[in-house]
Regions:
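Minor-groove-contacting beta-hairpin "wing" of winged helix-turn-helix DNA-binding domains
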Residues: 2-9
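Active-site-proximal alpha-helical scaffolds that flank and shape metal-associated catalytic sites
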Residues: 30-66
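Acidic/polar low-complexity scaffolding segments in large eukaryotic proteins
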Residues: 1-2, 24
């Protein structure tokens, strides 16, 4: 990542072409598709928990989470830890056919560790390698790897 920089349309297309070649040369497309479907099961759960960190429903009204309720925050962190354990196994499976994905697990571990130590910004804050930021980046990487776009039916 380079702050202030982004790929051109041509650069994105070339990157996706190379990713498609990687899947074909390594013969890992089918396995990656299966793993991606499993990722899609976890994705809405991660997003739900990230939302629970940011917003609470009190008396039927959604309000920003001010993090004053330590029990609520502890429950949300516990949910994220359970999801993270599931994600770790899946990410390990992704790394076998696609070793370039190996950097995501340590980054997610680091973010979750910082949340556990009381640094709540590492849960969802943009601009940090927060759990949500890294998860989103992983999702974008998987979409590009498989030549997909969000909202194309299976995202």
């Amino acid at each position: 990542r380079f702050p202030g920089w982004m790929l051109t349309g041509h650069g994105r297309a070339e990157g996706e072409r190379r990713l498609a070649v990687e899947l074909e040369v390594t013969g890992t497309r089918a396995r990656t598709e299966v793993l991606y479907r499993r990722f899609l099961v976890l994705n809405p759960e991660v997003l739900r928990v990230a939302s629970a960190w940011q917003v609470r429903t009190i008396n039927g009204v959604d309000v920003p989470n001010d993090h004053a309720d330590e029990d609520h925050d502890a429950a949300v962190i516990a949910e994220m830890e359970a999801l993270h354990r599931r994600a770790e196994g899946l990410l390990a499976e992704f790394e076998a056919p696609l070793p370039r994905l190996a950097g995501y697990r340590p980054r997610l571990n680091l973010a979750l560790g910082r949340v556990r130590s009381g640094e709540g910004d590492w849960f969802v804050r943009p601009g940090l390698d927060s759990y949500h930021t890294v998860w989103f980046e992983l999702h974008e990487n998987l979409l590009a790897t498989l030549g997909r776009r969000r909202n194309d039916g299976i995202d």
